[in-house]
């Protein structure tokens, strides 16, 4: 398997599609929000990017759950392995592509985490704490949790709930075997990354980001569920429900995405410290040069 990872706005999808076309294979998404139907602009699905040379590259684990659903690592592992086995059975090496570091690390290492039940006592104790306080509490549990996507109090409380359960119920099951993968990271300097994020955010607003969230609210999805998803869905929902003005919404969201990208890179550097070999490629290289660099590594590892 080939794994393509990197922070938001670095061009992961473009590279994965180019490789999949060249290798005649399929992609598995590792994005914790692209699994939801109807959440398109804010998650950057860019489905047109999967068209190349008159061919649509299949991408698994996109649009598999309704918006408003709660998805987790436990569910992702099962869905990933179904897609992974299906692709292997058809004689292809899958390409895993995304920015949710915990999903990527879990499937590569073969972590098996249980479906964690709610803990009302813990939730009551954590209610009223700020996101900063909750993030510090979560950090004390160590590396095995996806802190990159925790940008609302509700998500942070759920993350602590899972971490607390795992601490008290150690899981060493090998239900999911480790996967050997060539890991490619797209490296983008900070200033360029920040500019891309800001430019993309402006583009998403012009493409109908606010209308997308309004449509989700009008369809009956509770505001608190959209806030739970964080980033665009959190901030635009706050704007549409009158809890902030447009300027504050935009600047707050822009800052949150910059912080999110920084947390993603922190996670990937942590993966390297935990023993993963990541081959970093300049995200500013032309697509064909990126593809050639990966093909050389793929051939050397084959």
Curated annotation (Swiss-Prot):
Binding site for ATP: 6-13
Subunit description: Monomer.
GO molecular-function term, one example from the UniProt record: ATP binding
Cofactor(s) it depends on: Mg(2+)
Region of interest (Interaction with substrate tRNA), residue spans: 31-34, 154-158
Keywords: ATP-binding, Magnesium, Nucleotide-binding, Transferase, tRNA processing
Enzyme class: transferase
Documented EC number(s): 2.5.1.75
Catalytic activity: adenosine(37) in tRNA + dimethylallyl diphosphate = N(6)-dimethylallyladenosine(37) in tRNA + diphosphate
Protein task: Catalyzes the transfer of a dimethylallyl group onto the adenine at position 37 in tRNAs that read codons beginning with uridine, leading to the formation of N6-(dimethylallyl)adenosine (i(6)A).
Superkingdom of origin organism: Bacteria
Site (Interaction with substrate tRNA): 100
InterPro entries in alphabetical order: Dimethylallyltransferase, IPT, P-loop_NTPase
Residues holding substrate: 8-13
Protein name: tRNA dimethylallyltransferase 2
Record-level GO BP terms: tRNA modification
Protein family (similarity comment): Belongs to the IPP transferase family.
């Amino acid at each position: 398997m080939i794994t393509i990872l990197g922070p938001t706005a670095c061009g992961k999808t473009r590279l994965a599609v180019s490789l999949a076309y060249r290798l005649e294979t399929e992609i598995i998404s590792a994005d914790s929000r692209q699994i939801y139907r109807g959440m398109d602009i804010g998650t950057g699905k860019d489905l047109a990017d999967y068209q190349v040379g008159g061919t649509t590259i299949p991408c698994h684990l996109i649009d598999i759950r309704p918006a408003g659903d709660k998805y987790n690592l436990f569910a992702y592992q099962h869905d990933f392995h179904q897609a992974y086995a299906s692709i292997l059975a058809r004689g292809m090496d899958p390409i895993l592509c995304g920015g949710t570091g915990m999903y990527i690390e879990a499937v590569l290492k073969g972590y098996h985490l249980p479906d964690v039940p709610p803990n009302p006592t813990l939730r009551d104790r954590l209610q009223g704490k700020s996101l900063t306080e909750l993030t510090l509490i979560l950090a004390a549990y160590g590396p095995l949790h996806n802190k990159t996507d925790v940008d609302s109090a509700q998500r942070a409380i759920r993350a602590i709930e899972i971490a607390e359960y795992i601490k008290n119920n150690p899981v060493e099951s090998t239900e999911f075997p480790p996967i050997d993968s060539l890991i490619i990271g797209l490296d983008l300097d900070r200033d360029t990354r920040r500019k891309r994020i800001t430019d993309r955010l402006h583009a998403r607003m012009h493409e109908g980001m606010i209308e997308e969230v309004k449509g989700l609210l009008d369809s009956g999805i509770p505001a608190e569920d959209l806030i739970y998803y964080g980033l665009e869905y959190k901030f635009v929902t706050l704007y549409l429900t009158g809890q902030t003005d447009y300027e504050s919404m935009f600047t707050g969201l822009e800052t949150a995405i910059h912080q999110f990208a920084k947390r993603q890179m922190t996670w990937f550097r942590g993966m390297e410290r935990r023993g993963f070999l990541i081959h970093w490629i300049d995200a500013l290289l032309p697509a064909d040069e990126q593809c050639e660099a990966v093909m050389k590594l793929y051939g050397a590892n084959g």
